[in-house]
């Protein structure tokens, strides 16, 4: 991913699949959601194929690979199964994420510093198929520096702590943590993306941080789409982040 001169919006469609899997039906179709998102201005589509297959399925990923007009950001755990699948589909972008079976959603960043050899091997292997590999990490200098050392060209900073902050002082503290992480990542020569827990009422402050390349947003878009439709939900978010980034 070349660094854009404007902030990009990656739309995560996992929770369209969550709604489908709740009843084991064929609808709603995450592929349809992805195409609608592209029409509404999404710069890319993010999907997470989890080990437990709780939402996105292999078939979804294969279909998306064939029909997307933008690009796929394939989120995956660092497992042999996922590595082999990624080598099969060769997505434009791969984001390595931590994964545990009991979590409701990804609860924290990947501990790159604690497993550098393993992550370095994964980055090298996935880079050979032409994918740009990013690491989903906390906005922590130790993890950012480790990401640089293992050869990842990009990182995605976990904004969950900011999203969960309740008091004004906590929000300010966590926002500063993200902003500092962005600055440090850029100083390391990394492409810096961000995401997790962002919605229509908290995204503007993050989008205004200079240097962020892309925001990945999913749950809030799917929830808002229940009331306004998916295209409108994506379009509204795109308008918000572009306006915030210009100021």
UniProtKB/Swiss-Prot annotation:
The keyword Ribosomal protein does not apply. It comes from the Bacteria. Pfam families: PdxJ. GO terms for biological process: pyridoxine biosynthetic process. Its EC number is 2.6.99.2. It catalyses: 3-amino-2-oxopropyl phosphate + 1-deoxy-D-xylulose 5-phosphate = pyridoxine 5'-phosphate + phosphate + 2 H2O + H(+). The active site is at residues 48, 75, 196. InterPro entries: Aldolase_TIM (IPR013785), PyrdxlP_synth_PdxJ (IPR004569), Pyridoxine-5'_phos_synth (IPR036130). Keywords: Cytoplasm, Pyridoxine biosynthesis, Transferase. GO terms for cellular component: cytosol. 1-deoxy-D-xylulose 5-phosphate binds at residues 14-15, 50, 55, 105. The keyword Cytoplasm applies. GO terms for molecular function: pyridoxine 5'-phosphate synthase activity. Homooctamer; tetramer of dimers. Belongs to the PNP synthase family. This is Pyridoxine 5'-phosphate synthase.
């Amino acid at each position: 991913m070349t660094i854009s001169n404007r902030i990009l919006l990656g739309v995560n469609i996992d929770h369209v699949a969550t709604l489908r899997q709740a009843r084991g039906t064929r609808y709603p179709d995450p592929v349809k959601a992805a195409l609608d998102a592209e029409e509404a201005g999404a710069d890319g589509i993010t999907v997470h194929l989890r080990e437990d297959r709780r939402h996105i399925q292999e078939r979804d990923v294969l279909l998306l690979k064939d029909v997307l007009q933008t690009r796929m950001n394939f989120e995956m755990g660092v497992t042999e199964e996922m590595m082999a699948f990624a080598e099969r589909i060769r997505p434009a972008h791969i984001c390595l994420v931590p994964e545990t079976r009991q979590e409701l959603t990804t609860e924290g960043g990947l501990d790159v510093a604690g497993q550098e050899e393993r992550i370095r091997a994964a980055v090298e292997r996935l880079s050979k198929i032409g994918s740009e590999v990013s690491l989903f990490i906390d906005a922590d200098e130790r993890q950012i520096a480790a990401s640089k050392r293992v050869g990842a060209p990009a990182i995605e900073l976990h904004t969950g702590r900011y999203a969960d902050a309740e008091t004004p002082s906590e929000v300010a503290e966590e926002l500063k943590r993200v902003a500092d992480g962005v600055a440090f990542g850029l100083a390391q020569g990394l492409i810096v993306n961000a995401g997790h827990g962002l919605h229509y009422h908290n995204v503007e402050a993050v989008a205004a941080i200079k240097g962020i390349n892309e925001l990945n947003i999913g749950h809030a878009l799917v929830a808002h789409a229940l009331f306004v439709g998916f295209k409108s939900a994506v379009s509204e978010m795109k308008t918000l982040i572009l306006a915030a980034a210009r100021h």
